[in-house]
């Protein structure tokens, strides 16, 4: 059936910044939707405020907006662009909330809603409507009451009984949810949940804790044809959010009867809802009786549908987009086989395992338990012929230094109340001989999975050097998924020894295809996974070919920005007719889409796994510049193995990581650096700190995202850091730098071809020095730096890029002391940085593509990139933080990175651009009301001008007595600290009397008062800033929005002046 002729122009709503519960999977789905609609001749308009996405590239949609995602702003875009329809189902929970918001405001008259209509969204998101709907279908759901007050919640439990699951309606990743075992817990969780909910509603669910959880991905078209794309089994039982659970596909523990029952229910539900496109349905199954209940229906593409797409090779988002236009499944071709229609259900003859990646390494001291609220930032996926092989590959893919299962300390309580170490604790308990029945009782994990882990334990117990010299035993070890490093550790040998044994016995990886059809039809666009079974399906060509190493799972410090660069690199090579081979293991991202590269390998990014591919493909070179620290860490071992590293010489990469070599280089170039030292012990660190004077910045060498980095102000803090945060040794020294107080930091991205340097972007940080560059807001062009200082920065950047023989991208961070007119270099990274997508969007140049072309021999002059581009607009990048999902975390920013994603604001002036960036990041700055101010001692001398400006903008002011005294002459109401008794600032915040909070803190050991204030701001959604520079920028933004209407302008208009 042809597409709906009334639809000529469609607005695709993106999901906004990466956050816990809503990550790269929606860039993947949105990008697929853009491509899919354009293939059918539809004009596409995209709105998404995340600059790090592929979908916000100007060649992805006909028109791209990076405006904040609010119903009011999206409605302005709908009016301006005169679209016929909107597609909200590619934008996650954000997309659905925008659609329902537009509908409720009456702003969708005459506009078609594609995929799932507004009533369908409400039928599944509003729990009362969902309950009635399922009752009509005779489908069982857990008893549930939707309540709008704590009193109603207490009443609901009388019908259901404890324990209950408390979940806010219309939220993401279980935000604000929890399990209540008694009334006290119920009151606490329900109060918080009501504040979190988009519609001020909390769901009180009957507990099915301990039941098994299964998910079904279903597709339906307008002719009522339905297929099951994939079923998946959560290894963890109900009570652990599916985003927190280890997941396996296909489901391993469903008998034919139960499988058919869940399949029938899935098809019945999608038909009754009338969804056209993809839908995710979650079931709980009682392990004793086989009874099932429907837990949730997502009428949109989701994290699970991205996983199902990558696990099967069936592009759910792409096909959903075509169905939304009116096409039917039998009209849509399967892109992998090019023969079968999309109405053929995928068949898989392998096992897929997904493991979440948590951010607990960045938030020391917080509760690591996993449960109904999502905390993971990303995930990895691995494919094997057996569960044992797939799970061991997935563990390696996490990029956390694990070469396989590892023994950890645990208690029975840990097994009953799982943390991020769940898999290792299971392994350790089995290794210690704990009875599997007991483990099953404590964990509610199906014995099937416990047997599988026991297989690995038993096999490892047999490993000795002697046994490994038996070819059959060694082959079995590899078929179990054991890495060379793990086998070396178990046999007290080296990785090289194991590699030599494998060569001697001619035991090599064979590569199998993901082809959607279990090899029934020939795959035209295959992707591969490794195994040690017989039969290699990899066909190597004689073309020129290049390997690109991906960035692995999304984590704090290494986000979607690096995947963006990998995608651009692959597309650039394809443009040149070079065969591209991409290695990655992240199921959420665009880079692991089957049509981005010529060959995709879903593999761990380790030396062993990468070399396996290189040995068989024999590429002309490997690009390590774009995969963050994950791929950079492989540069030296790969080069030592004789692999050609393209672009910047690996000696230069290593040279800037080595402090002594880098210092010598800077001296040679007459570039200033803050005083520093390298310590191998606490005594050495203390001597350095006393020589260069406190405060000092301390950190381990070789890190990304500032992991375990702190500013310390005295010897006591230094000693605490050395004892608690790091293990120091001659192999792992500590870097001690003089901390430059009151400096302004800048980031510079440059392109270099070895002869010329192009300054792509100089970004001024909004936050003061000491806040990690990945957490600070930044602006292009710089707003407060004099031209002669900028010229010094340009000169330093050019000298450094040429001296290091950079071929491609480099990022350099500077600190400027304006009072001394001094420019200091903080660090240089001869690779793509997390700011590359932002700068690319701000100036309209695809930096990662150009960097790739340079690596293959092009020159900057070929692209007319010899002069810095002057832009007429202002672009601001703001960071987005996971504090709401991590209840014990403090919002104070420092040298260790905490943000998960970013937003962009673009306008003609700084104030409005900053306002848009804040709104896009979820910080709705007030135009009027009351501002509370409380600042640390050293900020008091600078607070008066800020207070004056706030008063002049018409705000009432309240402050603690010390801060109020420091701003003498400004009308400020004095308010008690929490520790001084009531009524105090906590009462004022809880009574919703405060509209903006300015609160700066005394370094690491922030006062309890400050923590309470900042935490309350997060919980209640009150805008807050934790630095004076942030406060100045916020007031500039408020002034701009008080005096001007917010206008919408596409990126195309900003860049091309259209």
From Swiss-Prot:
| Binding locations of Mg(2+) 3 | 813, 827
Q: What does the record give under GO molecular function?
A: ATP binding; carbamoyl-phosphate synthase (ammonia) activity; carbamoyl-phosphate synthase (glutamine-hydrolyzing) activity; metal ion binding
**Residue segments, region Oligomerization domain:** 400-538
Question: Where does this protein hold Mg(2+) 4?
Answer: 827, 829
MGS-like domain: which residues?
923-1058
Q: Where does Mg(2+) 2 bind?
A: 296, 298
Q: Which reaction does it catalyse?
A: hydrogencarbonate + L-glutamine + 2 ATP + H2O = carbamoyl phosphate + L-glutamate + 2 ADP + phosphate + 2 H(+)
- List the SMART domains: CPSase_L_D3, MGS
Q: For this entry, list what GO says about its biological process.
A: 'de novo' UMP biosynthetic process; glutamine metabolic process; L-arginine biosynthetic process
Presence of the UniProt keyword Metal-binding in the record: yes
Known PROSITE patterns for this protein?
ATP_GRASP, CPSASE_1, CPSASE_2, MGS
UniProt entry tagged with the keyword Iron: no
Region called Allosteric domain, residue ranges: 925-1058
Q: Which InterPro entries match?
A: ATP-grasp, ATP_grasp_subdomain_1, CarbamoylP_synth_lsu, CarbamoylP_synth_lsu_oligo, CarbamoylP_synth_lsu_oligo_sf, CbamoylP_synth_lsu-like_ATP-bd, CbamoylP_synth_lsu_CPSase_dom, MGS-like_dom
Which residues bind Mg(2+) 1 per the record? 282, 296
| Position of the signal peptide | none
Q: Which Pfam families does the record associate with it?
A: CPSase_L_D2, CPSase_L_D3, MGS
One GO CC annotation = cytoplasm
**Biological function:** Large subunit of the glutamine-dependent carbamoyl phosphate synthetase (CPSase). CPSase catalyzes the formation of carbamoyl phosphate from the ammonia moiety of glutamine, carbonate, and phosphate donated by ATP, constituting the first step of 2 biosynthetic pathways, one leading to arginine and/or urea and the other to pyrimidine nucleotides.
**Domain notes per entry:** The large subunit is composed of 2 ATP-grasp domains that are involved in binding the 2 ATP molecules needed for carbamoyl phosphate synthesis. The N-terminal ATP-grasp domain (referred to as the carboxyphosphate synthetic component) catalyzes the ATP-dependent phosphorylation of hydrogencarbonate to carboxyphosphate and the subsequent nucleophilic attack by ammonia to form a carbamate intermediate.
Q: Could you tell me which HAMAP family the record lists for this protein?
A: CPSase_L_chain_A (MF_01210_A), CPSase_L_chain_B (MF_01210_B)
Q: Which NCBIfam families match?
A: CPSaseII_lrg, PRK05294.1, PRK12815.1
Member of which family?
Answer: Belongs to the CarB family.
Q: By what name is this protein known?
A: Carbamoyl phosphate synthase large chain
Q: Name the species this protein comes from.
A: Methanobrevibacter smithii (strain ATCC 35061 / DSM 861 / OCM 144 / PS)
Gene encoding this polypeptide?
A: carB
């Amino acid at each position: 059936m042809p597409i709906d002729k009334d639809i000529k122009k469609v607005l695709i709503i993106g999901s906004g910044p990466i956050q816990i519960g809503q990550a790269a999977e929606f860039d993947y789905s949105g990008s697929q939707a853009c491509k899919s609609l354009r293939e059918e001749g539809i004009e596409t308009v995209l709105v998404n405020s995340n600059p790090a996405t592929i979908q916000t590239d100007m060649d992805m949609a006909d028109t791209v907006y990076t405006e904040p995602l609010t119903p009011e702003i999206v409605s302005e875009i709908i009016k301006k662009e005169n679209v016929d329809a909107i597609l909200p189902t590619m934008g996650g929970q954000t997309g659905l909330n925008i659609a329902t918001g537009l509908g409720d405001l009456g702003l969708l008259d005459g506009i078609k809603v594609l995929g799932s209509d507004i009533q369908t969204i409400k039928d599944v998101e509003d729990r009362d409507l969902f309950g009635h709907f399922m009752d009509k279908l005779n489908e069982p759901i857990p008893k549930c009451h939707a309540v709008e007050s704590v009193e109603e919640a207490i009443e609901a439990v009388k019908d259901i009984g404890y324990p209950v699951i408390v979940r806010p309606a219309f939220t993401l990743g279980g935000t604000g949810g929890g399990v209540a075992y008694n009334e006290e817990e119920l009151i606490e969780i329900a109060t918080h949940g009501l504040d979190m909910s988009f519609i001020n509603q909390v769901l009180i669910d009957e507990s099915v804790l301990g039941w098994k959880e299964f998910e079904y991905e279903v597709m339906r078209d307008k002719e009522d044809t339905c297929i099951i794309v994939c079923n998946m089994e959560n290894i963890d039982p109900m009570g652990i959010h599916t985003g927190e659970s280890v997941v396996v596909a296909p489901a391993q523990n469903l008998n034919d009867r139960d499988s058919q029952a869940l399949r029938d229910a899935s098809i019945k539900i999608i038909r009754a809802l009338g969804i056209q496109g993809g839908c995710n349905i979650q079931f709980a199954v009682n392990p004793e009786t086989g009874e099932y209940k429907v837990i949730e229906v997502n009428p949109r593409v989701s994290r699970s549908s991205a996983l199902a797409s990558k696990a099967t090779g069936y592009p759910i988002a792409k096909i959903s987009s075509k169905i939304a236009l009116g096409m039917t499944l039998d009209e849509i071709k399967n892109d992998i086989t090019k023969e079968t229609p999309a109405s053929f259900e995928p068949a898989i003859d392998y096992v897929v395992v997904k493991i979440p990646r948590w951010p607990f390494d960045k938030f020391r001291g917080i509760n690591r338990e996993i449960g109904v609220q999502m905390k993971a930032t990303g995930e990895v996926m691995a494919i094997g012929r057996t569960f044992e092989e797939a799970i061991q590959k997935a563990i390696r893919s996490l990029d956390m230094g694990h070469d396989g299962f590892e023994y950890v300390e645990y208690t029975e309580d840990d097994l009953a109340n799982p943390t991020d170490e769940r898999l290792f604790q299971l392994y350790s308990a089995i290794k210690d001989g704990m009875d599997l029945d007991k483990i099953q009782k404590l964990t509610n994990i199906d014995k099937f999975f416990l047997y599988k882990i026991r297989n690995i334990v038993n096999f490892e117990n047999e490993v000795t050097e002697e046994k490994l010299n038996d070819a059959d035993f060694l082959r079995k070890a590899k078929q179990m998924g054991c890495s060379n490093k793990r086998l070396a550790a178990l046999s007290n040998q080296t990785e090289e020894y194991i590699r030599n044994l494998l060569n001697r016995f001619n035991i090599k990886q064979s590569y199998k295809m993901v082809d959607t059809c279990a090899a029934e039809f020939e795959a035209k666009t295959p992707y591969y996974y490794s195994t040690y079974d017989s039969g290699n399906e990899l066909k190597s060509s004689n073309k020129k070919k290049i390997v690109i190493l991906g960035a692995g799972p999304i984590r704090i410090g290494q986000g979607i920005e690096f995947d963006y660069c990998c995608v651009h690199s692959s597309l650039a090579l394809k443009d040149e007719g070079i065969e591209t081979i991409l290695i990655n293991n992240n199921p959420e991202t665009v880079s692991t889409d089957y049509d981005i590269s010529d060959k995709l390998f879903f593999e761990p990014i380790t030396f062993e796994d990468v070399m396996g591919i290189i040995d068989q493909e024999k590429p002309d070179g490997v690009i390590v510049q774009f995969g963050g620290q994950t791929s950079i860490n492989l540069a030296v071992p790969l080069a030592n193995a004789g692999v050609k590293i393209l672009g910047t010489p690996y000696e230069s990469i290593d040279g800037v990581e080595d402090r002594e070599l880098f210092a010598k280089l800077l001296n040679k170039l007459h570039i200033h650096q803050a005083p520093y030292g390298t310590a191998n012990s606490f005594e050495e660190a203390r001597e350095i700190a006393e020589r260069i004077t406190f405060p000092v910045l301390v950190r381990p060498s070789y890190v990304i995202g500032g992991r375990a980095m702190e500013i310390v102000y005295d010897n006591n803090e230094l000693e605490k850091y050395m004892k608690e945060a790091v293990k120091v040794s001659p192999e792992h020294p500590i870097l001690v730098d003089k901390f430059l107080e009151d400096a302004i930091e800048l980031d510079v991205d440059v392109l270099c071809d070895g002869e010329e340097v192009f300054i792509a972007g100089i970004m001024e940080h909004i936050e003061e020095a000491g806040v990690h560059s990945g957490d600070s807001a930044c602006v292009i062009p710089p707003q407060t730096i004099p031209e002669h200082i900028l010229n010094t920065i340009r000169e330093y950047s050019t000298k450094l890029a040429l001296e290091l023989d950079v071929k491609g991208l480099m990022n350099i961070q500077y600190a400027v002391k304006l009072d001394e007119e001094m420019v200091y270099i903080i660090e240089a990274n001869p690779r793509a940085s997390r700011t590359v997508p932002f700068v690319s969007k701000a100036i309209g140049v695809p930096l990662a593509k150009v960097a790739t072309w340079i690596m293959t021999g092009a020159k900057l002059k070929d692209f007319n990139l010899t002069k810095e581009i002057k832009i007429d607009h202002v672009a601001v990048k703001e960071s987005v933080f996971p504090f709401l999902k991590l209840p014990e975390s403090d919002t104070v920013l420092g040298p260790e990175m905490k943000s998960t994603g970013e937003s962009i604001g673009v306008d003609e002036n700084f104030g409005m651009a900053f306002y848009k960036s804040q709104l896009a990041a979820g910080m709705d700055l007030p135009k009027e009301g009351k501002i509370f101010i409380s600042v640390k001692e050293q900020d008091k001398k600078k607070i008066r001008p800020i207070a004056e400006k706030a008063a002049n903008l018409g705000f009432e002011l309240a402050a603690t007595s010390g801060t109020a005294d420091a701003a003498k002459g400004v009308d400020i109401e004095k308010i008690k600290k929490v520790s001084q008794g009531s009524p105090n600032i906590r009462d004022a915040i809880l009574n919703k009397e405060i509209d903006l909070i300015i609160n700066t803190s005394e370094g690491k050991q922030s006062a309890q008062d400050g923590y309470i204030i900042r935490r309350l701001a997060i919980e209640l959604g009150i805008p807050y800033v934790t630095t004076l520079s942030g406060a100045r920028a916020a007031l500039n933004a408020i002034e701009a929005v008080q005096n001007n209407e917010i206008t919408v302008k596409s990126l195309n208009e900003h860049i091309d002046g259209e």
